[in-house]
Amino acid sequence: FNNYDDGLFKLHNILQENHIKFAFMGPTGAYLRCPYMEQNIITAYVNELPYEMGKLFPVEKDGNVVLYVPQSERFFLGQQEIRNLPVVSDIQLYLDLIKMPGRNEDQAEYLRENILHWG
């Protein structure tokens, strides 16, 4: 990718061309909804893995695109559109972030304070 945003739109196009239901989640969704820190890995929920991924290819580790196939369609409930990109609900973003390693807990707290307004 030329930059992170370029990667978002390229992945968006690949998934749409393959008729894959998806929504950006975790750090990527938070980057779009309530940016707090730089991101370098694109994360999304997909209802299935696409057969054709263009210039993307699977790797064992250290990839820059991570696709999750959730156990339930509930992960897509409340999906929102930001900059013409699908993003999971704010609550789902928060739940994703608090379960992820690294500084994602900081991002979750920032999202909670600025968007969710919980106690």
Predicted regions and their residues:
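C-terminal regulatory/effector modules of DNA-binding transcriptional regulators
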Residues: 51, 55-119
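Short gly/ser-rich loop at a beta-strand->alpha-helix junction or flexible surface loop bordering the NTP-binding
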Residues: 1-71
